[in-house]
């Protein structure tokens, strides 16, 4: 089974939201290695990530040196690059299928770090096509709500018994 590597947020990336169904608006690194989820994100998100994905390995940006990078006066995009590089090194991934929507500056940094990326729309789409139990439960809730909303109209159009 290939490893998968993502960078972005779950608000704008359907692929990342599929892997980790919790709203996170700031960019972070997510990997799937041998079927196990690895997440490197803001420490503020740790409890929400652990509640949503109890089996995931979660690392916070603080443990990767966030405050030291801030003290160095780096700009936000430079911090994103360095934390992402450190995240991938911490996870230990050397080769992965990546979402072609990964930002170029991040993909370039990963490649400069020696990571082999295989950009593959089909592989990412195939993962999203297989719905998780949480996604199926959401679909069922939406269908039940739609049926309940349509029921009065259906009864009124049916005519007298």
What are these regions (language model features)?
Residues 1-87:
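N-terminal accessory/capping or targeting/presequence segment of soluble
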């Amino acid at each position: 089974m290939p490893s998968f590597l993502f960078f972005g947020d779950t608000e704008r990336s359907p692929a990342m939201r599929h892997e980790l169904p919790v709203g996170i608006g700031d960019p972070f690194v997510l990997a799937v290695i041998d079927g196990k989820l690895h997440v490197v994100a803001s420490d503020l998100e740790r409890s929400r990530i652990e509640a949503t994905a109890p089996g995931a390995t979660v690392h916070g940006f603080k443990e990767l040196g966030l405050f030291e990078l801030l003290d160095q006066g780096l700009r936000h995009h430079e911090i994103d690059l360095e934390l992402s590089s450190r995240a991938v090194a911490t996870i230990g991934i050397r080769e992965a299928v990546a979402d072609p929507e990964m930002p170029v500056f991040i993909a370039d940094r990963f490649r400069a770090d020696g990571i082999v990326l295989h950009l593959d729309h089909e592989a990412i789409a195939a993962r999203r096509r297989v719905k998780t139990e949480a996604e199926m439960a959401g679909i069922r809730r939406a269908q039940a709500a739609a049926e309940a909303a349509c029921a009065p109209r259906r009864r009124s159009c049916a005519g007298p018994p």
